[in-house]
Amino acid sequence: MEKLASLYHEHISTLQQRTCEALARNQFDALLIHSGELQHIFLDDRDYPFKVNACFKAWVPVTKVPNCWLWVDGINKPKLWFYSPVDYWHSVEPLPTSYWTKEVEMIHLANAGDINSALSTYVKQNVAYIGCSPQRAKEIGFSERNINPKSVLDYLHFHRSYKTDYELVCMREAQKTAIVGHLAAYEAFQAGMSEFDINISYLMATGHRDTDVPYNNIIAMNENAAVLHYTALQHNAPSDIRSFLIDAGAEYNGYAADITRTYSAKSNNEFASLIKDMDAEQKALISTIKVGTRYTEYHIQMHHRIAKLLKKYGIVKDVSEEVMVEEGLTTPFFPHGIGHPLGLQVHDVAGFMQDDTGTHLAAPDMYPYLRCTRILEPRMVLTIEPGLYFIESLLAPWRESEFSKHFDWNKIGTLKLFGGIRIEDNIVIHENKVENMTRDLQLP
């Protein structure tokens, strides 16, 4: 914890420097960052699960407490109004005392409505509000111009791509937790459990509730693995278990892990061989990644690797790998991007920003679902998650195309029973190497 405290001190110093620059560029004196508010379910007396503002948890590892407010000006110690009411209906977070609390001035907020008077001397013309409730900001006294100003957010989001040492430690810890869950889920799969029960096994192993994980776990067997964001969780195991895809993460101090593995129920069939080769291609792709190259290039490179696999397994025949990629024959098999930035959010911000003024570079027209077009630089954290699926809705147009004769539709029909493959690691870009946080922890 001592090391974490030291790294957190450096982290706050970095955030203060970024804030100073963002404020100076935009003629603001300070930022007021709101943790968020509970959202009521329509015509009910309950709330949706609370999800904290990522801009807030960038500063303090407070992820489950609404109605908190953070004042930062880049120079003085940040002020944190921490909401901790007297409440016998609900559990309440006490004022924290931890490795990070000496870096902020803690102010007890006993009633959420008291924030208006508490902030009366702070809300001035040159203060910006960052948060999810423009209406609350207006009630406090913010003008429309000062609510979530785009130029401020663009600057902060762009620089959030470069993780501090504290953030990298937190992300490595999230990896450890997620991997414990993945190993437990694999054991549950081997024991013949259902998707629902495998998910329970994962949550128990990680110590997460289903509202704590950074995204809804994807636990998919057989054809369900062809649904990219499958979250239905069948309660009964299939009578014939053929394959298992798990895409599940964990969170540590607000930072996410996002890991995917695919398994064949039998080790001696063609699908198992395809998984093994896909795993090799994913690792080979990572070995080519280096500073100064646009992320888009690795997405395109992976399409060439997918073409090689399609040809090797006779899924697509009598056409060169180059033509497969040029004509888009690989796209129905690999319809999503190679990955995305990772951090405080699973799909972290600024994937398309080319500079800190927010210059946008969209994904190529041919690959519209790619989530990052940045040039890779040290301290960036990204996922590498190639996929190879057998999705009828994407394959159907090719049945009637001029290239239909090159597809082995009988083989595709057989492989559709397995759904698909996705293999995902989380990597850190360093000056002279790529750190694979996932593989470094020995997840096969």
UniProtKB/Swiss-Prot annotation:
Q: Which residues bind Mn(2+) 1?
A: 258, 340, 385, 424
Q: Which GO terms describe its molecular function?
A: aminopeptidase activity; metal ion binding; metalloexopeptidase activity; phosphoric triester hydrolase activity; proline dipeptidase activity
> Which SUPFAM superfamilies does the record match to this protein?
Creatinase/aminopeptidase
**Keyword line:** Dipeptidase, Hydrolase, Manganese, Metal-binding, Metalloprotease, Protease
Q: What is this protein called?
A: Xaa-Pro dipeptidase
Q: Look up the EC number in the record and give it.
A: 3.4.13.9
Leader sequence segment: none
Organism placement in taxonomy: Bacteria, Pseudomonadati, Pseudomonadota, Gammaproteobacteria, Enterobacterales
Cofactor requirements of the protein: Mn(2+)
Q: How is the cofactor bound?
A: Binds 2 manganese ions per subunit.
Task: Using the UniProt record, name the top-level EC class of this enzyme in a single word.
Answer: hydrolase
* Recorded catalytic activity of this chain's protein: Xaa-L-Pro dipeptide + H2O = an L-alpha-amino acid + L-proline
Mention any one GO cellular component term assigned to this protein in its UniProt record: cytosol
Listed binding positions for Mn(2+) 2 are: 247, 258, 424
Q: What does this protein do?
A: Splits dipeptides with a prolyl residue in the C-terminal position.
Name of the gene this protein is made from: pepQ
